């Protein structure tokens, strides 16, 4: 028998201490990893409910277990909210992650050995877009497109590759691209060779939901996304379509269950429903616009200070900072900024001379800092602090710059806590 006063503290103090240390880190460090954000207390509340106890293989009204009448309501609400939020006619809220959502789409639309065309990792693509170490590169004939000399997608080159290789599926979307993608052009290219168009909007789903970035739903055969990142929900995946194609939708359903997953995580699906509903609130659009404005403010400072921003700027929530010209590695810059309590991630840049474990760039994103209340002024200051550390690294010793910036970071984090 359980009692509701059971606590982790006192039962496993080592685990509890690590958990509390992470809470402290999130409050005391500035988060600039583009794929991270802070979930609302409502989202976290849903994930801590007794829904975690319920097994519910199947779909609402068609379960393989009894006692699902209440979780059916939960999943139906999540589906309803997802469709309404994105203007979709189909939604599957069961994928445990964005990668599993992509894997289900592969399983539904293409066969092992088929050709797929996606963005390369060093151009800003994702592992599941055909990278060699991933299932998408191991089990499929993956052809990759990159960026032109200006750091932009060359649609004519994508079209040429499509005509040459005749892919069964083309993947648009990114994990590190800072410009607006022409979804209609991608659909035109796909239609020209008879390919399916998959759009992975994991990074920009929140921007799309708020209407501050063009939606791929009118153009793609299928759209996948995560539910965290700019959506500020729980970690999970989502498959959407506006094609009104019952045959394809049936394939998506069976590719998720039983094709790649068993029981859905009902506590996470409840949290997804909450995040979809939160994204329909009026202040969510203002938040997403601020995310973009903050990213623009930061990119502008880096450019003014002589640093190269891939693609020349940003029109979304992130940008890539190339350190090739400065002779710095992403790995070293990541570590130096971490010592100043600024969290970023090292990232490959186009034609990167370094290995993927070292890299020559940083990926910088503003969703998390915007959630905690940063505006353009704070973000411009923050970019300047980062430049101070990078400048000092080029002189050989950044320890004093790191200490100075750390003090500034502590002050602004105390003024703008994540959870008040």
UniProtKB/Swiss-Prot annotation:
CDD domains from the UniProt entry: SHMT (cd00378)
Reported cofactor(s): pyridoxal 5'-phosphate
Binding-site residues for (6S)-5,6,7,8-tetrahydrofolate, renumbered to this chain: 121, 125-127, 355-357
Pathway, per record: One-carbon metabolism; tetrahydrofolate interconversion; Amino-acid biosynthesis; glycine biosynthesis; glycine from L-serine: step 1/1
GO BP, one annotated term: tetrahydrofolate interconversion
Listed Pfam families: SHMT (PF00464)
Any one GO MF annotation of this record: pyridoxal phosphate binding
Residue numbers bearing the N6-(pyridoxal phosphate)lysine modification: 229
EC numbers on record: 2.1.2.1
Subcellular locations according to the entry: Cytoplasm
Role according to the record: Catalyzes the reversible interconversion of serine and glycine with tetrahydrofolate (THF) serving as the one-carbon carrier. This reaction serves as the major source of one-carbon groups required for the biosynthesis of purines, thymidylate, methionine, and other important biomolecules. Also exhibits THF-independent aldolase activity toward beta-hydroxyamino acids, producing glycine and aldehydes, via a retro-aldol mechanism.
Protein name: Serine hydroxymethyltransferase
Species of the source: Chromohalobacter salexigens (strain ATCC BAA-138 / DSM 3043 / CIP 106854 / NCIMB 13768 / 1H11)
Lineage: Bacteria, Pseudomonadati, Pseudomonadota, Gammaproteobacteria, Oceanospirillales
């Amino acid at each position: 028998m359980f009692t509701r006063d059971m606590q982790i503290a006192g039962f496993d103090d080592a685990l509890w201490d690590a958990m509390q240390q992470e809470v402290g880190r999130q409050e005391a460090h500035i988060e600039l990893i583009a794929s991270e954000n802070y979930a609302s207390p409502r989202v976290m509340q849903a994930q801590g409910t007794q829904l975690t106890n319920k097994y519910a293989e199947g779909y609402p009204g068609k379960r393989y277990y009894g006692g699902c009448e209440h979780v059916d309501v939960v999943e139906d609400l999540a589906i309803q909210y997802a469709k309404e939020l994105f203007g979709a006619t189909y939604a599957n809220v069961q994928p445990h992650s964005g990668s599993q959502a992509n894997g289900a789409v592969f399983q539904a639309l293409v066969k092992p050995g088929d050709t797929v065309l996606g963005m390369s990792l060093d151009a800003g693509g994702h592992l599941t877009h055909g990278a060699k170490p991933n299932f998408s590169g191991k089990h499929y004939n993956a052809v990759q497109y990159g960026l032109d000399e200006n750091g932009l997608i060359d649609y004519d080159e994508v079209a040429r590759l499509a005509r040459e290789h005749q892919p069964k599926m083309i993947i648009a979307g990114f994990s590190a691209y800072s410009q607006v993608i022409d979804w209609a052009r991608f659909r035109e290219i796909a239609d020209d060779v008879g390919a399916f168009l998959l759009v992975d909007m994991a990074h920009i789903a929140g921007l799309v939901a708020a209407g501050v970035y063009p939606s791929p739903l009118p153009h793609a055969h299928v759209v996948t996304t995560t539910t965290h990142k700019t959506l500020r929900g729980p970690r999970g995946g989502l498959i959407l379509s506006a094609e009104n194609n019952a045959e394809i939708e049936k394939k998506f359903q069976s590719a998720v269950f039983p094709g790649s997953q068993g029981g859905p995580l009902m506590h996470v699906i409840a949290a997804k429903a909450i995040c979809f509903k939160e994204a329909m609130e009026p202040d969510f659009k203002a938040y997403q616009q601020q995310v973009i404005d903050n990213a623009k403010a930061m990119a502008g400072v880096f450019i003014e200070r002589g640093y190269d921003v891939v693609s020349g700027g940003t029109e979304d929530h992130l940008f890539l900072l190339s350190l090739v010209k400065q002779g710095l590695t992403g790995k070293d810059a990541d570590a130096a900024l971490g010592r100043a309590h600024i969290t970023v991630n090292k990232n490959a840049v186009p034609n990167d001379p370094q290995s993927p474990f070292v890299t020559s760039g940083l990926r910088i994103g503003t969703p998390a800092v915007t959630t905690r209340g940063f505006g353009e002024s704070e973000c411009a200051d923050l970019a300047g602090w980062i430049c101070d550390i990078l400048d000092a690294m080029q002189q050989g010793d950044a320890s004093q710059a790191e200490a100075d910036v750390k003090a500034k970071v502590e002050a602004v984090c105390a003024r703008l806590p994540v959870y008040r």
